[in-house]
Amino acid sequence: MTHWIAGEWVAGTGEKLQSHTPYSHELLWQGYSASGEQVDAAVNAARRAFLDWKKRPFAEREQKVLAFAELVKANSEQIAQVIAKETGKPLWETRTEAASIAGKIAISIRAYHERTGETVREAAGNQLVLRHRPLGVMAVFGPYNFPGHLPNGHIVPALLAGNTVVFKPSEQTPWTGEVLMQLWQQAGLPAGVINLVQGSKETGIALAQSRGIDGLLFTGSANTGHLLHRQFAGQPDKMLALEMGGNNPMVISEHYGDLDATVYTIIQSAFISSGQRCTCARRLYVPLGTKGDALLDKLVSVTANLRIDQPFAEPAPFMGPLVSEAAAQVILKAQADLQALGGKSLLEARALHAAFITPAIIDVTAIERLPDDEYFGPLLQVVRYQTLAQAVELANDTRFGLSAGLVSTDDGEWDYFVEHIRAGIVNRNRQLTGASGDAPFGGPGASGNLRPSAFYAADYCAYPMASMEGETTLLPATLSPGVEL
């Protein structure tokens, strides 16, 4: 049974859907996609459940979410292994994701009270009350790179606020979605409060176009997110929260400090998760001169020797495969395209077996107009620069704005950088892929809108209701002109 609709597991009636390991082609999961009628059934079930769920005390909703958190903790190793098999990420990495699923729930609960709770104050003889109310039925679209952690950054705040949910995982990771939905089932949520529909493009279109949803919470590619944005144009009654990707710049100052620490920070920024994090560094700005040369020499040497293997290998790998052979081919084609434009490979990516490829580092300084694309994989573009002002200007030459970073021991350089850079996540002497769960996550431009994360997700899961209240009506001492009683 593939889908969880109205408190029951049902088989799909759409096209066949399968999930294989990206490292051995082993069949992990199979079923049939949800048809348009089944998507409608899930949305209708969520609509019916919303009428009751929104009225339940917060403490009761919180108890169900906390029960889910305990189940995640109890099953964290199984979750980690499922994610590792389905995405190809090393087991050490998926274990941190499994822990994050439960860990961010406490942050979401705190956010509910701090950002969407109820406040009362007195002013000019009136009682001013701020309340928050749920929006209704929320469609949640999950990505494949963090198939457990990122969707729950939407789902948990939505449920706490009193919304109901229809969740569509990525078609690349249906098994992870099913395992997590089984835990929600065990947590005892009433029928219809959360629903699962599996499928690819057609299922996603049916859910996004449903007239019964009140909002859509999306984490995924910029292309899909922009299609959703155009689709929702002219529908201000629907909430649309988009967390998309970035063409993220990382600037290395001549004052970068320790060479090994800097190289390690770059590798963690560019190649962790095989480059399949939306905050990964895509463009590396390196100063001209001997210090920049030394940095690149060491970076190429260390990157060439990164351990690449299947998720459960011993000793543990740093990188696994990409999520699919198709994704690997996209990176290899991007490398070829950049070479054709005049890029010089410092370390050339090579296709291995299955979806494995080696990382690429390519000097693109000579390319007059660098394509503004997100290469979602282990491909790092290097640009040599003369001044920090030039580097920042080049770094800002992108339609995206997700993350950026500066490696520098000079406080004045950091002050200049943080004042002039355009990005939502800006780190100093830290990897670009590091972010706090209780900080805003996202950025301006084509990287999305709002700030989808455990804490700030509370903002788009409820709307504020402002009230001015008094126990009785009041008759002023002086009436408005033209009124006689």
UniProtKB/Swiss-Prot annotation:
InterPro entries: Ald_DH/histidinol_DH, Ald_DH_C, Ald_DH_CS_CYS, Ald_DH_CS_GLU, Ald_DH_N, Aldehyde_DH_dom, SuccinylGlu_semiald_DH_AstD. It holds the Pfam family Aldedh. Keywords: Arginine metabolism, NAD, Oxidoreductase. Its EC number is 1.2.1.71. SUPFAM superfamilies: ALDH-like. It catalyses: N-succinyl-L-glutamate 5-semialdehyde + NAD(+) + H2O = N-succinyl-L-glutamate + NADH + 2 H(+). Coiled coil: none annotated. The keyword Oxidoreductase applies. It comes from the Bacteria. NAD(+) binds at residues 220-225. GO terms for biological process: arginine catabolic process to glutamate; arginine catabolic process to succinate. The active site is at 243, 278. Pathway: Amino-acid degradation; L-arginine degradation via AST pathway; L-glutamate and succinate from L-arginine: step 4/5. It is an enzyme of class 1 (oxidoreductase). The keyword Oxidoreductase applies. One of its GO terms (molecular function) is succinylglutamate-semialdehyde dehydrogenase activity. Belongs to the aldehyde dehydrogenase family. AstD subfamily. Catalyzes the NAD-dependent reduction of succinylglutamate semialdehyde into succinylglutamate. This is N-succinylglutamate 5-semialdehyde dehydrogenase. It comes from Vibrio cholerae serotype O1 (strain M66-2).
